[in-house]
Amino acid sequence: MASSPQVHPYKKHLMQSQHINFDNRGLQFQNSSLKVGQDFSDNKENRENRDNEDFSTADLPKRSANQPLINEHLRAASVPLLSNDIGNSQEEDFVPVPPPQLHLNNSNNTSLSSLGSTPTNSPSPGALRQTNSSTSLTKEQIKKRTRSVDLSHMYLLNGSSDTQLTATNESVADLSHQMISRYLGGKNNTSLVPRLKTIEMYRQNVKKSKDPEVLFQYAQYMLQTALTIESSNALVQDSDKEGNVSQSDLKLQFLKEAQSYLKKLSIKGYSDAQYLLADGYSSGAFGKIENKEAFVLFQAAAKHGHIESAYRASHCLEEGLGTTRDSRKSVNFLKFAASRNHPSAMYKLGLYSFYGRMGLPTDVNTKLNGVKWLSRAAARANELTAAAPYELAKIYHEGFLDVVIPDEKYAMELYIQAASLGHVPSATLLAQIYETGNDTVGQDTSLSVHYYTQAALKGDSVAMLGLCAWYLLGAEPAFEKDENEAFQWALRAANAGLPKAQFTLGYFYEHGKGCDRNMEYAWKWYEKAAGNEDKRAINKLRSRDGGLASIGKKQHKKNKSISTLNLFSTVDSQTSNVGSNSRVSSKSETFFTGNPKRDREPQGLQINMNSNTNRNGIKTGSDTSIRKSSSSAKGMSREVAEQSMAAKQEVSLSNMGSSNMIRKDFPAVKTESKKPTSLKNKKDKQGKKKKDCVIM
């Protein structure tokens, strides 16, 4: 017979454990069992070979030409039968165990050629001899597999004879429950009945073992099972106890059992159990979050060399979870984990070293070490540390002193690596680069749309708006212009809170792009964008509410007040050119004839100035003008009042200039001002001080 493809090892193990024979017509099962002490016609040499056979890699036995088609089952104490028909079995040779009720569909027969041929020296079913309390595995095989519990009952055989292995201890997802539900229905509560029997058999075998690895795997399995059970009041029939039990009570029972085993192992210093128990405390898997207990266990496991626990302890010290913040200790745990190639620890240590965080120095050597740690993290980057190549790409894109030379080509490679690992900012940045092109890569519409789509599907609002722009303009040959699709992406980005997208959506509603024209919705989105400080939306609302007109009035009023200040200086400059106070007064009176309210203040200002000059000969009337200006500013607005105070200063300066002009035109007054210098009269001294103050 020609050789056929190799049989899957799990399938071989299942077939050997169940003593299934095949012929060319297909797979047939018979529900009968052999006696343990049955004598087979095999020679001694073959019997010795069979005793040392590793059944995980064994081949299926050949059926001789005269051998009848008989399928025999030999089960261990922990291996259930695949059928319920045990009428012809001899129960006195083994302990019966109630199996799960599985209805297998064997209508699709599989030929022997599809399962593979077997050599002539393969072991016969008689080599599988068992006792009532042991399985067919030897002690050496147990050490190889690192399991002392036979979990072959977790293998299921579907209608196509394909063997599926459930990862009972390796994976969080409980695949066995999914497989059983396939036959019994996902919404059928009785699907837990065979599962509970399986768990009970697993529990009884674990109680006989003192191996910490076995106990830990059982606790892990119970924890995973409890987390996959839905918390509901649906009743499940328990075969071991009278009555029914709800799924919520069953979940609590499994959680307590898992927690009990993990606590016992943690006390003995088993680091894996310490980490799993701490993770359950920190995540609230056991009912509530207990960060303090979690930190103690993380720290204890880290001291035993558990790398993940060291990283988690560093995080607790950094964030103050269950303990006080301590940057120095956090960095020490981080260095321990990073030195053992923990990707997240290498990434964080590189980031902190380059940017000088967590109390690390900011010298060049520390920054260079940060670049090295980021490079190591990028080389081992995964989906959880996809930001490592992104941060390293930013450094190589900009460069750093003479240590890191800018390399845009290498930066692009790092951006692509980060985007391939699912890093959203890298995908958005690549889309923007390919949209316009740069010195390293040219414009590529297809790649731009690809990266925009990748980031948009993960919720990036900037990428959504980028796709909106492409659909609004068209991105051939990828796709043609589609305003409806552009509107949908703008709507998603606006709902995500992007101000530009909110303004864009308002524009679409206003002009009917991809939707019906609706001004009410348009102004609604304009208001949202303005609330998020979008300048275009703010200007849009001002134009609607007449804000521009009110701003124009305020600006016009401000200009008039400024021109009023210029008028004061104009009047004073004219008085200095003419050289007489009377001409200044007449000039100001003729200039303000148009507005009586405005004429009052300058006229009173000049009249008081003239009267004071004639009376004292020295004082220019600046104090009176200031009082007049301050009294007139009471009815003005706050803005005009501030401008009037500036006007007062210019008026006083212009009056000081006019006082010099007065002293030149009237020499008699000038000579009289010098006489008090030789007198000892207090009044004359006060007049001299006033005169000096005005001149200064």
Curated annotation (Swiss-Prot):
Organism ancestry: Eukaryota, Fungi, Dikarya, Ascomycota, Saccharomycotina
Subcellular location: Cell membrane
Protein's UniProt name: Chitin synthase regulator SKT5
Region (Disordered): 37-67, 90-145, 576-696
Membrane topology: Lipid-anchor
Listed Low complexity bias regions: 104-126
Subunit structure: May interact with CHS3 and seems to be an adapter (along with BNI4) to link CHS3 to septins.
Keyword S-adenosyl-L-methionine: no
Outcome of gene disruption: Decreases CHS3 chitin synthase activity. Decreases cellular chitin level. Resistance to Calcofluor White (cell wall stressor). Normal CHS3 RNA level. Decreases conjugation frequency.
The keyword Cell cycle appears for this protein: no
Lipid addition sites, S-farnesyl cysteine: C693
Function: Activator of the chitin synthase CHS3 which polymerizes chitin, a structural polymer of the fungal cell wall.
Polar residues bias (residue ranges): 129-139, 576-593, 605-634, 651-661
Bias kind Basic residues: ranges: 680-696
Positions annotated as Sel1-like repeat: 271-306, 307-342, 343-382, 386-423, 424-460, 461-498, 499-534
GO BP terms: chitin biosynthetic process; fungal-type cell wall organization
UniProt keyword annotations, A-Z: Cell membrane, Lipoprotein, Membrane, Methylation, Phosphoprotein, Prenylation, Repeat
Propeptide: 694-696
